[in-house]
């Protein structure tokens, strides 16, 4: 059973070491994340990928334990492909998020140390935030990780549901860079994914070229 002390330790592990951002607008969804991986106060890796894809139109951002995140990423891909090869057919983004929430809820007493954003475009833009207990919320904009308080301040101040996908991508980039400047566990650069009805485009930005 998870006691309060352990729960706080788990939450600290999830919050420690990254900043990810998701933004939903009329044209699609933007997912963004920094590239630093930390082990305590040590920079373990400067070029980690935290924006991943289930399909060309569905992506995720990851925060938490690397091993748990790798497993959960495989689970998400299996959920999608299983539906495709059975009579059920293509699964919606909401369906994928709900299935993952069920998995996380079922293991909450021995939890996977993860926080996941799932975003993409099926018949419309969708963006979901899931924590390690299986809590799931649909969001217009959201930030996770140790730098999320800084990033969320930028999003709160500048988000507009009528902004274009390019404007949302620029906002996501600036939100993560703001966290890089103030959060020691967030760093190197930013990957920004623009997901729309025709697929996705990915951009990379760095404070300087030397990494």
UniProtKB/Swiss-Prot annotation:
It is found in: Cytoplasm. The keyword Protease applies. GO terms for biological process: proteasomal protein catabolic process. The keyword Protease applies. Its main location: cytoplasm. InterPro entries: Ntn_hydrolases_N, Pept_T1A_Psome_bsu_arc, Pept_T1A_subB, Proteasome_bsu_CS, Proteasome_sua/b, Proteasome_suB-type. Pfam families: Proteasome. Its EC number is 3.4.25.1. Residues 1-17 form a propeptide. The active site is at 18 (nucleophile). One of its GO terms (molecular function) is threonine-type endopeptidase activity. The formation of the proteasomal ATPase PAN-20S proteasome complex, via the docking of the C-termini of PAN into the intersubunit pockets in the alpha-rings, triggers opening of the gate for substrate entry. Interconversion between the open-gate and close-gate conformations leads to a dynamic regulation of the 20S proteasome proteolysis activity. Keywords: Autocatalytic cleavage, Cytoplasm, Hydrolase, Protease, Proteasome, Threonine protease, Zymogen. One of its GO terms (cellular component) is cytoplasm. It catalyses: Cleavage of peptide bonds with very broad specificity. PROSITE patterns: PROTEASOME_BETA_1 (PS00854), PROTEASOME_BETA_2 (PS51476). Belongs to the peptidase T1B family. The 20S proteasome core is composed of 14 alpha and 14 beta subunits that assemble into four stacked heptameric rings, resulting in a barrel-shaped structure. The two inner rings, each composed of seven catalytic beta subunits, are sandwiched by two outer rings, each composed of seven alpha subunits. The catalytic chamber with the active sites is on the inside of the barrel. Has a gated structure, the ends of the cylinder being occluded by the N-termini of the alpha-subunits. Is capped at one or both ends by the proteasome regulatory ATPase, PAN. This is Proteasome subunit beta 2.
């Amino acid at each position: 059973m998870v006691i309060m002390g352990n729960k706080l330790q788990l939450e600290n592990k999830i919050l420690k070491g990254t900043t990810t951002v998701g933004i939903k607008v009329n044209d699609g969804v933007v997912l963004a994340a920094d590239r630093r991986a930390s082990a305590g106060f040590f920079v373990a890796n400067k070029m980690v990928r935290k924006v991943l894809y289930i399909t060309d139109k569905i992506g995720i951002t990851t925060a938490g334990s690397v091993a748990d995140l790798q497993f959960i990423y495989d689970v998400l891909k299996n959920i999608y492909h299983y539906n495709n090869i059975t009579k059920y057919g293509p699964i919606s983004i909401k369906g994928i998020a709900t299935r993952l929430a069920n998995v996380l809820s079922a293991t909450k007493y021995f939890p996977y140390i993860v926080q996941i954003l799932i975003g993409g475009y099926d018949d419309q833009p969708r963006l979901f935030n899931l924590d390690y207990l299986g809590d799931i919320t649909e969001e217009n904009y959201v930030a996770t990780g140790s730098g999320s308080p800084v990033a969320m301040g930028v999003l709160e101040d500048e988000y507009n549901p009528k902004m274009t996908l390019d404007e949302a991508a620029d906002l996501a980039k600036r939100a993560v860079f703001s966290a890089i400047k103030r959060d020691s566990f967030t760093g190197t650069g930013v990957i920004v994914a623009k997901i729309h009805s025709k697929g996705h485009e990915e951009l990379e930005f760095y404070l300087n070229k030397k990494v």
